[in-house]
Amino acid sequence: MIEDNKENKDHSSERGRVTLIFSLKNEVGGLIKALKIFQENHVNLLHIESRKSKRRNSEFEIFVDCDINREQLNDIFPLLKSHTTVLSVDSPDQLPEKEDVMETVPWFPKKISDLDFCANRVLLYGSELDADHPGFKDNVYRRRRKYFAELAMNYKHGDPIPKIEFTEEEIKTWGTIFRELNKLYPTHACREYLRNLPLLSKYCGYREDNVPQLEDVSNFLKERTGFSIRPVAGYLSPRDFLSGLAFRVFHCTQYVRHSSDPLYTPEPDTCHELLGHVPLLAEPSFAQFSQEIGLASLGASEETVQKLATCYFFTVEFGLCKQDGQLRVFGAGLLSSISELRHALSGHAKVKPFDPKVACKQECLITSFQDVYFVSESFEDAKEKMREFAKTVKRPFGVKYNPYTQSIQVLRDSKSITSAMNELRHDLDVVNDALARVSRWPSV
């Protein structure tokens, strides 16, 4: 990423010939993946050749001459690094060099299809299970998990989510969870959750005898809030997961927990995702709250991402709110756990007002009840507090989501900021025009 030079001229569109040398691992399709990056970013290749690497016998080195501008080079460089080892970049004088204040900024997706590069970096579980996992000794369950993992790993942006023929055992497990949780929702869940759950039953097949299909749920959410579902094999890193939220994409597991203990899972399964998260992702205010946490994480330091992820944990996963003078639950981890849902509103749980500066320092517990739960006055209250907290994130740029192109606008110079202001000015003109029309016809 390139900043303006001292003359305040924008050279990002000036073109030049650049030679890149990168090494490929000896794997099927490695070169195709690398060349696709150039194609998708509209970079013209002038010459390409390959040779056996002199550094390692198992790798090949690729020489590429291309006609490229500085902005394109900034876009493809981190993408290449995710698939290859970039050994050399020869940038001639005619491609203007400018001070790069963003060299140390961690890579983040700029367009929604970039999520293909990070959605498969599963940290935990997936097709592999720990020895203490309920399904570790069940070979049939392990094969089933491998099947779901392969589906998620092969998924690319734009693909329809594969429809699943769930087994009788999986449907029974889902049914037990669905039935028991629905006994608690009327007295424990927030009103927004209760408003959306019947719609999911009507349009997505939320029933005791049916596990909803992620494709149906994704289409429903797109119409409600612009969110979509992307299948994932298991736990992602906080950075990769939050990056998806910035694009209103929710990474969602498709497997069902082991049937030996329907009321417990050491990991997020599709029961947790569908019953815990989805009803509130259909709520506009909550959807915006989730996206803003994701946007704040883009390009942030590891320390900041961890703080944002912890705030997400104590709101989106385990958050409480006040409604009609009573505590109600909006956290997905609670809304998908019978025992902890009861505990959180039992009067015995420790609760504190939600403050991001406090919540981000609280330890997140995975296999036991939380030591403390944080209470927000409303989604809007939580959103405003997170906005103030996001202002403390140290980045040499701002970001803005463009819903038309499903891409991130990086606001880092006068040109990009002016462009964003012009878009806002147009939106304000539309609103002002509407106000003027309404004032002329007050009965409308």
UniProtKB/Swiss-Prot annotation:
Pfam families: ACT, Biopterin_H. It catalyses: (6R)-L-erythro-5,6,7,8-tetrahydrobiopterin + L-tryptophan + O2 = 5-hydroxy-L-tryptophan + (4aS,6R)-4a-hydroxy-L-erythro-5,6,7,8-tetrahydrobiopterin. Residues 19-94 form the ACT domain. Pathway: Aromatic compound metabolism; serotonin biosynthesis; serotonin from L-tryptophan: step 1/2. Ubiquitinated, leading to its degradation by the proteasome. Ubiquitinated is triggered by phosphorylation. Its cofactor is Fe(2+). It comes from the Eukaryota. One of its GO terms (molecular function) is tryptophan 5-monooxygenase activity. Oxidizes L-tryptophan to 5-hydroxy-l-tryptophan in the rate-determining step of serotonin biosynthesis. Homotetramer. Interacts with DNAJC12. This is Tryptophan 5-hydroxylase 1. It comes from Rattus norvegicus (Rat). The gene is Tph1.
